[in-house]
UniProtKB/Swiss-Prot annotation:
Homodimer. Interacts with TsaD and TsaE in a mutually exclusive manner; TsaD is the preferred partner. Also interacts with TsaC. The lineage of its organism: Bacteria, Pseudomonadati, Pseudomonadota, Gammaproteobacteria, Enterobacterales. Its main location: cytoplasm. GO terms for cellular component: cytosol; EKC/KEOPS complex. It comes from the Bacteria. The gene is tsaB. NCBIfam families: T6A_YeaZ. Keywords: Cytoplasm, tRNA processing. GO terms for molecular function: identical protein binding; metallopeptidase activity. It is found in: Cytoplasm. This is tRNA threonylcarbamoyladenosine biosynthesis protein TsaB. It comes from Escherichia coli (strain K12).
Amino acid sequence: MRILAIDTATEACSVALWNDGTVNAHFELCPREHTQRILPMVQDILTTSGTSLTDINALAYGRGPGSFTGVRIGIGIAQGLALGAELPMIGVSTLMTMAQGAWRKNGATRVLAAIDARMGEVYWAEYQRDENGIWHGEETEAVLKPEIVHERMQQLSGEWVTVGTGWQAWPDLGKESGLVLRDGEVLLPAAEDMLPIACQMFAEGKTVAVEHAEPVYLRNNVAWKKLPGKE
């Protein structure tokens, strides 16, 4: 099985390829340069792996939340690639991707993900990983004021690992929560960490056709234009 993953939802730009268990990945910090960097990165990964788009089984994309512009760029490019090669698509949460990153780096199984959402809010989620490697908690994804995050944290207990830029943007976020918090050493999502999630979704048949691939902004006032003729 071969899955190509692309993410441009934050300041980072990343591409990764799952090739029957072998992972090739490229990660760059390139604010405002996503459109210039992402396609060369895709081509580099494919060339290095001796793979073409027609060899791929599915294309995973970072569906958000994150920068509105970044999410749009990522899904637009992913749709273009998938359309040309007639590939199904898999939308992967950027928040869950960071949780997977914390597990890869330090074995975290209980993760609090927070991305700075600007406008005095954070993109938030609480994840727990089961013994089969499946992450649970997608239903907790939301855009929240820090004080609401604090209320959510007070309903939890024990030790949790923190990931994302939200903890830097709001350094008091976890104070007086009653939780034991450890830094997961993951600030931004990476396509490499999308792959295990995407592989599981692919195995479960959770793919969508190109015209049905959509972002998840978590803010309801952002419109998304589908591909022409696919309304």
